Swiss-Prot record:
Keywords: Aminoacyl-tRNA synthetase, ATP-binding, Cytoplasm, Ligase, Metal-binding, Nucleotide-binding, Protein biosynthesis, RNA-binding, tRNA-binding, Zinc. It is an enzyme of class 6 (ligase). This is Threonine--tRNA ligase. CDD domains: ThrRS_anticodon. Its EC number is 6.1.1.3. The N-terminal domain is an archaea-specific tRNA-editing domain that hydrolyzes incorrectly charged L-seryl-tRNA(Thr). Catalysis of tRNA editing is performed by the charged tRNA itself. It comes from the Archaea. Homodimer.
Length: 614
């Protein structure tokens, strides 16, 4: 950003004609202005300017104002100070943000001349040493992440509706809550240590891709099975909510010259992946919001259709700090099973949010874990809807940390983050839901009511199991806790890349092994055959390293008795049974979960050794 400040005895401007195809709308208040003893801030918004630049500009402008003592500050868009200008839509939003922040930090009157118009002006400069100053506003230290500074008030809210100061609450019965509070309120977090989850990720084919940007993973054939299973499961979950849901697909890049896209990006604030194409600036989506909202604005929606959801497993991008990147948890590219539910009003959104909340808690319980929750809430919602908030917390059946922020900053009034406490005793956000009162209007999404009048819906955002990779982190973290307790770690059978491995002791038993494999495969399960010329001990050890739930060893006795000898990873038991019995066990363990086919050859002798098994 470049600014030229002039302390003027008198200043007059008048808008004459459009300089842009879509200039800012003229009003009686802004089309012409007369000022005395005014600090005129001629401003060029440059490519890459953001909230941090605005904050620095505010500091510079107020520093000058404190020295020259004007009655008024006028922000005057002036493109001639720079050759590296931001797009018009982005420049306008930055100018509005500059105006807003100046108003919030000074008692002086602050005005802004209209953007996108040719204007005539007359200027009478005081002529003292500080009357004309030129400044270039930049943020040094490349790669700095810009975070919105907010005044927050923290409370502990219990299921019985009592509110406590976090410093005075008794955490003896709530150690997980204390870990979350220590981090969010007091800025304390355990230093961590060796995270076994990283080893588990690599074991199953989740690796960094060194030929891409930092924070991008590649997914081997074992990892693909896990990913596809969870993607399908996430769709099954949203279909079970009892409301109509539409599955869609779309693009992952959106033009920042579109006003709603830019406004949403500015609200997101930081960690944006941006790119230029043909002199236009695009942002890579950080969730499915952009595409779904862009689609919904073109739909004709009746009140009779509400509530309904729109769902996509969206490839999403966030420019996370390099030092914070973590396999399957903090990534620059990931997959988000993003559901948005349109509701008539806030009351309906609250009702549907309870259904979403129940499903979030139900899903984490299925893998033997529990969440500790952070409720981010606006001050208006905290004051006016306290009973509603207490009802949400009662359903948690556990105290929550509440963070109250000023109203009118974000698009949501309630943003609930669900954290696990991982094997290193650190909070890790997984699932979430939000009640959004702003994006319906921002993207001009409307529905028609009984009287034919148009309204903007209230929108619920939710990732019921979290991002796909973060759900996998939770699965592996659960296994890490098992190992920490001295148990054999495992993952649920429905997610195991290979659910059954058949090991014939000799090649002469291969025909029988193939018949057993065919029967299991026809029942819908993933099975392979270790036909390599390795020793039985090595084959069993290799299957154990892959955490295969059921290892079937076939020898002469099994062939003669038409049985199978099964080693069960979860219990470390070894049992002789018929193939149908194993199929019944698999059906029970994978009931209500998706069936995804094998992503590699059935015979191990046909497979190269992947990097993660080398």
């Amino acid at each position: 950003m470049r600014i030229l400040t002039i302390h003027a005895r008198k200043f007059h401007y008048k808008a004459l004609s459009q300089a842009l195809d879509k200039p800012e709308e003229l009003t009686n208040e802004n089309k012409e202005g007369f000022f005395e003893n005014v600090l005129v801030v001629f401003t060029s918004v440059e490519e890459g300017d953001n909230e941090k630049v605005v904050e620095k500009a505010v500091t510079e402008i107020l520093d000058i104002a404190n020295r020259v003592k004007p009655k008024t500050i006028l922000l005057y868009p002036y493109a001639h100070l720079s050759s590296d200008l931001a797009s018009p839509s982005q420049a306008l939003e930055i100018m509005k943000l500059l105006e807003q922040k100046l108003r919030g930090k000074t008692d002086l009157e602050v005005y802004r001349a209209p953007f996108g118009w040719y204007k005539e002006f007359m200027l009478d400069c005081y002529g003292h040493p500080l009357s004309e100053l030129s400044k270039t506003i930049r943020i040094t230290g490349g790669g700095e992440v810009v975070r919105r500074e907010l005044k927050k008030e923290f409370y502990i809210l219990t299921p019985d509706g009592k509110v406590y100061d976090p410093e005075k609450f008794n955490y003896d019965k709530y150690p997980d809550l204390k870990i979350l509070v220590d981090k969010e309120v007091f800025g304390k977090e355990l230093p961590g240590g060796v995270n076994r989850v990283n080893d588990y990720c690599r074991k199953f084919g989740f690796e960094w891709e060194p030929m891409s940007d930092h924070g991008h993973m590649r997914y081997g054939p074992h990892a693909v099975i896990i990913m596809e299973s969870i993607m399908q499961y996430s769709w099954n979950i949203v279909r079970s909510l009892g409301i109509p849901v539409y599955k869609v697909m779309g693009t992952n890049m959106f033009n920042l010259s579109e006003k709603p896209v830019l406004e949403h990006a500015l609200l997101f604030g930081d960690r944006l992946y941006e790119l230029k194409v043909d002199n236009e600036k695009f942002v890579l989506r950080y969730a499915a919001c952009h595409q779904q909202f862009a689609m919904l604005r073109d739909w004709i929606i009746s009140y009779k259709n509400l509530p309904f959801g729109m769902f996509e497993v969206a490839d999403s991008y966030r420019l996370e700090q390099r030092g914070e990147l973590n396999l399957c948890f903090r990534l620059r590219k990931f997959y988000m099973p993003d559901l948005h539910i349109l509701n008539r009003d806030l009351n309906e959104a609250i009702k549907i949010s309870r259904i979403v909340q129940d499903k979030i808690l139900e899903e984490i319980a299925k893998i033997g874990r529990k969440y500790v929750a952070l409720y981010n809430v606006t001050s208006d919602f905290f004051d006016k809807y306290r009973d509603i908030l207490i009802e949400f917390v009662r359903r948690e059946n556990y105290p929550v940390l509440v963070s109250v922020i000023p109203s009118g900053i974000y698009y949501w009034v309630l943003n609930v983050e669900y954290h696990i406490i991982d094997n290193l005793n650190r909070p890790r956000e997984i699932a979430t839901f939000q009640i959004d009162i702003g994006n319906g209007e921002r993207f001009n999404i409307t529905y028609t009511d009984e009287k034919g009048e148009k309204h903007h819906p209230v929108i619920i955002h939710t990732a019921i199991i979290g991002g796909i990779e973060r759900f996998i982190y939770t699965i592996f973290d659960t296994a890490a806790l098992m190992e920490k307790e001295g148990k054999t770690p495992y993952i649920p059978t429905w997610l195991a890349p290979v659910q059954v491995r058949i090991i014939p002791i000799k090649n002469e038993y291969l025909d029988y092994a193939e018949k057993v494999a065919e029967k299991i495969e026809n029942a819908g399960f993933r099975v392979d055959i270790d036909d390599r010329g390795e020793s039985l001990g090595k084959k069993i050890r290799d299957a154990g390293r892959e955490w295969i739930p059921y290892i079937v060893v076939i020898g002469e006795r099994e062939v003669r008795s038409n049985t199978i000898n099964v080693r069960i990873r979860r219990t470390n038991d070894q049992k002789v049974m018929v193939t149908d019995e194993l199929i019944r066990i698999l059906e029970e363990e994978t009931k209500n979960y998706p069936r995804v086919s094998l992503t590699m050859p059935k015979y191990l002798s046909k497979r190269p050794i992947p990097s993660y098994h080398a």
